[in-house]
Amino acid sequence: MIKKMIRLNLDDLALQCGILAGTFVLTQLITACLLLFAGVRSSLQLSGVILPLASGLLLLIFTTVYTSFSFEECIRFSHTRRSALAGLLGLSLFQAAVAMGLSALLTLLEQWFTPTLWTALSGASGYELWIGGYAAGSYGTESTFLLSIDRISLPWWAVLLIALGCVLEGVFFGAFVQRFGRKGFWILWGAWMVFIFGQSVIHWDDLFHSVWFLPVLIALVVLTFLWSVWSLLRAAVRQ
């Protein structure tokens, strides 16, 4: 079932990979233009943050669509609820592995090759690399100036949590819409709008550094996923 679902949705996987590759190329073009035409003397290697987050957003969207619509289609084609859920979950996890793998590959490509390219575009005689706010070394001479490059990336465990969390929450969003229909969609949309417009009153730094934030977040994701499994295994399929 899982292999069949993967084969049937290869176009979705290609679309996700294309979006990630396009995001990578766009960020490199913007950086190159700033160095070449704006005369800036510093740059950021951000693919290690941007690409995992973009992958997570894509996984959330596609998993939501699979769960809310494709799940019922599978049941209409004589699959059991259990096999349909397993197939869609396996599909989403496979796409997560490919998306995060591509993100890691593009991040390594940026880290290996762009310092030399950016140095040439900026007219610098070398570059100074910073990782996580700490100097990691200087390369070249200071006959003109050294280009300052700050490398920012997420730790591997955060990337894994993003991938798994977005897949599980995508299942929850899809199950919510599947059970409650249009009302469920608007409830989720309203919650999202509250989250977006409530940014000014949310103290993210305090939340991220609190000892309970990550355990509570993980518990919430697990509980919503368990509810999703319960709901989908008892779902009424609309004809």
Residue map of PLM features:
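Hydrophobic alpha-helical transmembrane segments of membrane proteins
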Residues: 1-72, 81-239
